[in-house]
Amino acid sequence: MVCDITELKAHDGRKVYLEIIKDLATNQLLTWSISQHPNLQFALDPLQQLLKQLPHTGYQLTLHTDQGWHYQHRAWRKLLRQGNIRQSMSHRATCLDNAACETVFSKLKAEIGPDTSYRNQEELSQAINEWIHFYNERRIQTKLGNQTPLQYEQNLVA
């Protein structure tokens, strides 16, 4: 799994922050958080959601992030330990180490159109949420055998 944060700005100049956790096996965006402030709770929310929905298999998972302060915080690391998740971090100033997230952010920004075309944070946040559901449920991906991430996951467990 990979995790990262991106920033978008509505027409009124106010910012919206998006954090995603992506499953590399299915390309599904497992959890996400949208906020007007990139504070610690914003960063912890998707990880807390992830821990609630992950099945307890006994296997240790790995979650890769950049070296942002959120991911170095003791509260973040404590949640990882509680979920038996191994932390992996990019090298300093090496965004390509987390290309799987950067690609999603690039597609989001291209497909929802210019973030400044949304009048305010609420409109932009709604567009982001709608796009994430589209990405998981309706956006066909060649890498997944021309299936959506959700279809691919369902076929894996079938």
Residue ranges and their predicted role:
Residues 1-158:
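Charged DNA-binding/catalytic regions of mobile-element recombinases
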